Amino acid sequence: MLSILKKLFGTANDRTVKKLFSEITKINSLEPVIQKLSDEELKNKTVEFKEKLKNGATLDDILYEAFAVVRESARRVCGMRHFDVQLIGGLILHQGMITEMRTGEGKTLVATLPAYLNALTGKGVHVVTVNDYLASRDSASMGKIYNFLGLSVGCIVAGMSDEAKRAAYNADITHATNNELGFDYLRDNMKYSIQERVLRPFNFAIIDEVDSILIDEARTPLVISGPVNDNSELYTKIDKIVRQLKAGDFEKDEKLKTIHLTELGITHIESLLSNENIIKPDSGLYDFENLTLVHYINQALRAHNMFNVDVDYLVRDGQVMIIDEFTGRVMEGRRYSEGLHQALEAKENVKIQNENQTLASITFQNYFRNYPKLSGMTGTAMTEAPELKDIYNLDVVAVPTHNKVTRVDLDDEIYGSKKEKYDAILKLIKDCYNRGQPILVGTISIEKSEELSSVLNKEKIPHKILNAKFHEQEAFIIAQAGRFRAVTIATNMAGRGTDIMLGGNPEMLIEQLAKDHSYEAKIAEIKAQIAEEKKKVIEAGGLFVIGTERHESRRIDNQLRGRSGRQGDPGKTQFFLSLDDDLMRIFASERISGVLRTLGLKDGEAIHHPMISRSLEKAQQKVEGHNYEIRKNLLRFDDVMNDQRKIIYEQRTEIIKSKDSYDFLNSTTAELAKKIVLTFMPAGSYREDWDIENLSVELHRIFSIKFDHNLVSKNDVTEEEITKSVIQMAHDIYKSKEESYSSELMHNAVKYILLTTLDQVWKDHLYSLDHLRQGISLRAYAQQDPLSEYKREAFNLFEQMLDNLKELFIQTVYHFHIDLKHVQKEDVSLEHKKFQKNMQESREDPAFSKYNAGSSLEIDLKPVVSRIDPKDRNPEDPTSWGRVSRNELCPCRSGKKYKYCHGANA
């Protein structure tokens, strides 16, 4: 019934596209008029549009004419004219939606339409790509159009100076990678002046490969970190012990990706730990003093049994480097958190880098939701449309192709074993190679791609291998995958964003010759050669894409298929599967193997059966649903931190912008003075209950006040009068500092102290939230909702953080001393710039350089003294306590607050 209705009325997508086609006629009707304009008149249209906007017109009022102007400019400058379907894509992007356009349909050119239109407001447009190569390529090629129309273009890549970045972000249109944008946002919110920041306020972003950025990478936060204590020796010892465990000592579940020790394993490992003198002979692994070892053992177990070299990570130049499971690319600088990366380093016997504490972090989910207007484009988004709508409020519209798709997608071939599957793939590759048909073979890991490469080498079939180990050559290799007799092996979607043209990509071949002085004479020769090869390739059947396994996500499979058949080109795709494949082995029904044998599957024979195809699709849907729930759950928890992050960042910006910090200083002084007095002189209490001795100690600790006991000798004195006296004494101390150092210097010092204190308590708060998050799921066993509990406790921690901020800020202001001999006007700024220079960012836990500050306003940037989980603190060993909040109960279990016990002299 539903299919009949769809045929009668069309899908919602069909109706949207039909409506947009009616909009295109209005743009097309302007084309003859725009074509008659001279270059100068065409350029002046930008000035005219800006003037209209200044006088109250909206972007929609000038949309049709602006699109027509961009189309004509692209034709004159680049020799490319936007097709009608590309205009539709531009309209979808301008309306803040995601456009799904097949590979080769010219998404890069589509982005010029909404980018130009929205840049006319002067608020900036960000065009976001997945790597530096694409950002540089697109800004250079499309920048010609923008420059022709009088708009400025910037490009952000890794390694640029702040000055260069600031100029690029101030351009009308900025091309940048998602990683650099996120890190620049975090870095900006760690700077000490508005002038040092590089980003402008958020306006409009167009995300290329939007599914990769908003879905595949959504679970990995951007993190700026600093080191905690060095435990490399312990990681090495634990690794040595875990290597001695045998089958039966632990159980693992590949489906749920979990691993744990059995009772037998616990007994065995306790014996090994005792032999290495890591635990006492008479103690157990789960005794209180040994609980921290459980974490190290679990991570070592995961490293040895759940993570494989050349599949999940590479070892290069003495470093463990993570491989992106979706793209097969090395994720430069990214490190696994919670000690897993250190466990992998111990496993691979490379230098173990320190664990790190989070200083700042954000997920792409929350970063991109900062933009008032967001849009994106990709070749595969429909399968993820519900998630994109639910999380980002982005609708997906599939745009029809300019030319009809002639690619043939063949049925999957299923074999009993991996060897039989590879034999069939090899047979097909040989056949295609002999006929000259180019082949692109997609694998799911570096290990599999190198395995297949060795098979082809034995058969003496020349080929190119494209994986994370050779990512520098990625774009060039993939661009030439359509040449006559080309055989290319690629991990998943390596090279995404680069078109595979039948016969080869002439532009990239010409680029390779650019260093040769005689290259111009060879251009015509190259173009003629490519044209000849294209004819041969089309006769051979176009690009044949072979999938060696099904991915967990249907979308990744569709992306691989989409490499063939661009712009109406012929082509074929086919997946080869075996019962040994991970998806079949872990997720598909166990009945499949029996069914295949029943159907008479013989060695070397393939089988096609609808039930198997359905089972595979259900397995993929199950995994996709599971991953979606993980991302959605991550967002629910991250939203709690995001709300707090917004408050802190807004407060930090206000502090930086403020010309006077005295209001906050005075109000906080009064608040703390009242709080301290009432703590030791409770309202309504008798004089004999007043603790004047400890009141004096606390006032000196916080305000550096020498309290006069005679103030309380009067019989009729009240706590209000004492509070007023304390506030006045604090005010006098501050005034004396002002007289000694100057008002301007004190103002700068107070602002700097406030910012550094805010950064310190926020850093500690992030650490507390990390620990809270790690164990919060266990609340479910107590019939409590983990999310509700996390929200409640995170709020309490946030309030405690604000209390700590006030106390530390006031304490520092009233106690600090400046050595005027060494103070320069720019000292504060210079110290912070040095700090920023030594700071590193990554997708997870980068190293953080030690830094010793100069002699003015001493800044202690030693490795972070981190907060320790209370259950891991030894009451008799203060060195095991880590950082303790002054308002916490003292870990020695005296029952007193830390600030009145062991922290009294801290």
UniProtKB/Swiss-Prot annotation:
Belongs to the SecA family. It is a peripheral membrane protein. SMART domains: SecA_DEAD (SM00957), SecA_PP_bind (SM00958). Its EC number is 7.4.2.8. The gene is secA. One of its GO terms (cellular component) is cell envelope Sec protein transport complex. One of its GO terms (molecular function) is protein-exporting ATPase activity. This is Protein translocase subunit SecA. The lineage of its organism: Bacteria, Pseudomonadati, Pseudomonadota, Alphaproteobacteria, Rickettsiales. It comes from Rickettsia canadensis (strain McKiel). Gene3D superfamilies: Helical scaffold and wing domains of SecA, P-loop containing nucleotide triphosphate hydrolases, SecA, preprotein cross-linking domain.
